[in-house]
Amino acid sequence: MEKNYFKKIIARDANGLQVISACCSDSKVKIEDIKFLKKNKIFLLLIERIKKEKKSEEKLKSIIKFEYIASVKSKNINQNNNSDILELLGIDLFRDKKNYNISIYFKNNAFITLSSEILEVTLEDQSEQ
């Protein structure tokens, strides 16, 4: 009997974030599944991703959780159309004087930029489809 283990990857540096980005590239995200919990300083993406670790076409529901987020900016994303689906291309990290700027890139030149003093990002698988 094969056991199913769901992954949980925690990134606290640029290398860890690259691993999460690689696992999540080509994922689908509904606009309604993007949430910023300002009071808790948490930004969430519920994604449908392909399980690249096993080189299969198996699809998973996963959550990418960004913690300690001070601000969120987006461009070329129509937030009024909740049913639109974005395709995630990758996640990148830039550092200025005291903050991390995390850029989440989607197809069609859409992106979200998160600002945080501390880098902590978690990718956690929720269920197989």
Question: How would you describe each model-predicted region?
Answer:
Residues 1-129:
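Surface-exposed, interaction-prone regions used to assemble/regulate multi-protein complexes
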